């Protein structure tokens, strides 16, 4: 692997620059490496096994270029779809946020989401949650291993009409707001990275993802929304509740597919599925029109 990495980033290096070390990092979707050279450090990502069926890399590459002027992401130096590799800027001594630290950064995160949602950018790709569920179902080869899946699925799909009644607004969205996709430089600049799933969707999807992935309390959600909500970025609590259910359903199926490809995520998938079931039980709609 080190040999492949050296070959791929050689075009980025000056004549006197050479690779000193290659260190593997974590990542649920891709294989990530920190590459140190005599002059610089890079993050090298190899697209994970089976991800070509999940992620449209042509769309991702286009979206990264389109969003570049917003200044939200780290620099991308190389995006080679055929080779399945991406080389990004490494932020020295950056702190990766987690489910605790993210809750101290509302004043920085809210403007980032406002910027993308109100940008008017027409991203490639439409993130259609119900189609995503069908996609993963078609990719999974074995019987879906979750209790009462067919009955739960029927209940999940009953939300489609309610969403349509509420109105789904097409805006540019990140889609995958896990806390680890926010990194902060020593100077205090916050970056939003990993735009693989970026596409057009309702901004409430992003808010639901932010809240779910970092397990916000109801009070923390309301506090964040007080930073985010504006005339350009309105809020729908009911859509957030629906999107939480859809996200847990989708990522529980994503886990089944990835584990069929050889990954092992322990109880991650079943925990998300069970949370979707709980979300359905507690969802009561609202008076939103």
Where does each model-flagged region fall?
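All-alpha amphipathic helical-bundle segments outside canonical DNA-binding/catalytic cores
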Residues: 234-244
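An alpha-helical support segment within catalytic cores of ATP-dependent transferases
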Residues: 1-16, 20, 121-175, 186-187
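A general structural signal marking secondary-structure boundaries and capping sites
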Residues: 16, 71, 94, 113-121, ...
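ATP-binding pocket architecture of kinase catalytic cores
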Residues: 23-24, 29-128, 146
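Extended, well-ordered alpha-helical scaffold segments
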Residues: 105-108, 148-159, 265-279
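ATP/Mg2+ or Mg2+-diphosphate-binding catalytic cores
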Residues: 254-289
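Active-site activation/catalytic loop segments of kinase-like enzymes and analogous catalytic loops
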Residues: 204-232, 245-263, 275
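Active-site acidic catalytic loop and adjacent metal/ATP-binding pocket
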Residues: 29-37, 43-44, 160-207
